[in-house]
């Protein structure tokens, strides 16, 4: 794998999987690899940003934390870019932008994700689309082998598949990797020349890699009733079955696969209470499942982020640690350290306070529903944007 200190756009036509044949990157700027800025200037400073949210978090083997989200413009749209920051003191202080992915023109970078693979490499994923949504988008990634360094060297950007991937991949017992990549059930919101219709590929798609991420191929798809943006996550149960949870208008839909993700059961509404927003689920080192959802009194608001545990693969849930009860908190993502500490990141008030926040806690805190452990921390500010709109 080649690494660069300065990453420049390259054509990636050979990697494209769009329906009806791949147009040339020159004719479709969303297919061009964007510049990856490893020395962001003042134009990306906190005091320039009017909007930010949708964060992800990861932890290197030496304890270095990484946080990622997207910002740019006044909201979701063509001015969006992805921002990466880091902390070398367990989240007490955070750097300014270390990497910015900012495609030129009306192409945006959004819904980013961080993930350490089993080899210890840190992947930085993002979606790329012409304007807000072009009907196809695309999952892109850069990778580093030295995520413990404050300024790691990154690979050149690569387009992995169509769709949008904002949640971490799942490594199966076989060693295969599954990546959730959604094609939204929405008409393209851009001009006709840059609009696409992927037809039956619209859904909660699953991409497969058998070679540690070198190549990805379409494996299968689940469809749940009243799906919205999918934002699906997959866990492998102890019996080997795959359980997919999908964002839906009523909260969370679900589907099961007994053949490694090739085919999926008819989607249905799950029994997990939640609102129309992203959730987070992950298997912990203990074998228990951690689930973070919204549990507001009215059943609708993006408030009351709560963490629960399951020791029976999601049949029942115990505990209940209130992460943040305020209106406007959303989009949790998390990672567990070897010492058992769970780091959770989420956003608060994307166009108001514009905060990216972190919490740290343990399984015992979740089980008891209280912030008891010495490692427990609430509402740690990772970043706050302070830009002011021009009058």
What do these predicted ranges mean?
Residues 1-5:
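Positively charged n-region of N-terminal signal peptides that target proteins for export
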Residues 6-18:
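Bacterial N-terminal signal peptides
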Residues 24-391:
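Asp-box/BNR beta-propeller blade signature and adjacent active/binding-site loops
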């Amino acid at each position: 794998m080649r690494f660069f200190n300065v990453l420049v756009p390259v054509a990636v036509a050979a990697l494209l999987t769009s329906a009806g044949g791949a147009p040339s990157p020159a004719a479709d700027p969303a297919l061009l690899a964007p510049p990856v800025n490893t020395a962001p200037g003042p134009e990306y400073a906190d005091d320039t940003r009017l909007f930010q949210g949708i964060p992800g978090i990861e932890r290197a083997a030496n304890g270095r934390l990484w946080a990622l989200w997207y910002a740019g413009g006044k909201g979701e749209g063509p001015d969006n870019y992805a921002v990466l920051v880091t902390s070398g003191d367990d989240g007490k202080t955070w750097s300014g932008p270390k990497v910015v992915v900012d495609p030129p023109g009306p192409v945006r970078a959004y819904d980013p994700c961080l993930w350490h693979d089993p080899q210890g490499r840190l992947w930085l994923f993002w979606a790329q689309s012409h304007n807000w949504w072009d009907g196809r988008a695309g999952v892109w990634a850069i990778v580093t082998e030295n995520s413990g360094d404050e300024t790691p060297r990154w690979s050149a950007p690569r387009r992995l598949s169509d769709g949008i991937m904002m949640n971490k991949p799942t490594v199966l017992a076989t060693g295969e990797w599954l990546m959730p990549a959604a094609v939204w059930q929405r008409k393209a919101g851009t001009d006709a020349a840059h609009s696409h219709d992927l037809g039956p590929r619209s859904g909660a798609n699953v991409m497969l890699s058998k070679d540690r991420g070198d190549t990805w191929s379409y494996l299968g798809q689940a469809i749940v009733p009243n799906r919205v943006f999918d934002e699906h996550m997959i866990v492998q149960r102890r019996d080997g079955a795959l359980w997919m949870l999908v964002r839906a208008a009523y909260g969370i839909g679900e589907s099961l696969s007994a053949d490694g993700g090739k085919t999926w059961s008819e989607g249905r509404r799950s029994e997990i209470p939640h609102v129309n927003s992203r959730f987070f689920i992950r298997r912990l080192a203990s074998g228990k499942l951690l689930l973070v959802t919204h549990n507001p009194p009215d059943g609708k608001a993006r408030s009351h982020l709560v963490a629960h545990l399951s020791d029976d693969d999601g049949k029942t849930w115990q505990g209940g640690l209130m992460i943040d009860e305020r209106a406007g908190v959303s989009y949790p993502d998390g990672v567990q350290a070897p010492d058992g500490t769970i780091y959770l990141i989420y956003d608060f008030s994307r166009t108001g306070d514009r905060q990216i926040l972190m919490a740290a806690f343990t399984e015992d805190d979740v089980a008891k529903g209280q912030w008891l452990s010495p490692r427990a921390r609430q509402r740690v500010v990772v970043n706050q944007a302070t830009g002011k709109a021009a009058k």
